[in-house]
Swiss-Prot record:
SUPFAM superfamilies, per database record: Lysozyme-like (SSF53955)
Gene of this entry: SPACA3
Chief localisation class: secreted
Alphabetized CDD domains for the sequence: LYZ_C
Family listed: Belongs to the glycosyl hydrolase 22 family.
Protein name: Sperm acrosome membrane-associated protein 3
GO terms assigned for molecular function: lysozyme activity
Residue ranges annotated for the C-type lysozyme domain, each copy included: 36-163
Taxonomic path: Eukaryota, Metazoa, Chordata, Craniata, Vertebrata
Organism: Bos taurus
């Protein structure tokens, strides 16, 4: 073997994987420019203004608890699932059913792009979350809420907030 002729073996990559990785990087870059991390009380006031207090029988504290355990109050949070779907925004809404991502064959029940869920003004996110909550399982649609908030005393989530 001659010096300098060795090169690492290149493994072929399926184009879909490369495109998914590129889309993931672009999504992260785009969302990071507009992301916002709310404080607990600031988010409580915003969600109250959107009418989530008492919506479908859930308290404002339920929503704040969900947002904390789903995203840490970060509007730009994006999580990639093993099945290729993504969870987006402060409530980590999944692209498998609720929003349009790269896969054109999803129901898109919220009739919006997943990137809309990264907007710090939360309007689209709240509209979609309200639609999800209309499902029979309500906030139970979110694993984070079921594991961390359901059936617990959540009063601390809004204590001290001037609402």
């Amino acid at each position: 073997m001659e010096a300098g002729s060795w090169a690492p073996r290149r493994w072929p990559r399926p184009p879909g994987i490369v495109l998914l990785a590129l889309a993931s990087v672009l999504s992260s870059l785009l969302s990071s420019g507009q992301a916002r991390v709310y404080s607990r009380c600031e988010l409580a006031r915003v969600l109250q203004d959107f009418g989530l207090e008492g919506y479908r029988g859930y308290s404002l504290a339920d929503w704040i608890c969900l947002a904390y355990f789903a995203s840490g109050f970060n509007t730009g949070a994006v999580d990639h699932e093993a099945d290729g779907s993504t969870n987006s925004g402060i409530f980590q809404i999944n692209s498998r059913k609720w929003c349009k991502n790269l896969n054109p064959n999803v129901p898109n029940l919220c009739q919006m792009y997943c990137s809309d869920l990264l907007n710090p003004n939360l309007k689209d996110t709240v509209i979609c979350a309200m639609k999800i909550t209309q499902e029979p399982q309500g906030l139970g649609s979110w694993e984070a809420w079921r594991h961390h908030c359901q059936g617990k005393d959540l009063s601390d989530w809004v204590d001290g907030c001037e609402l």
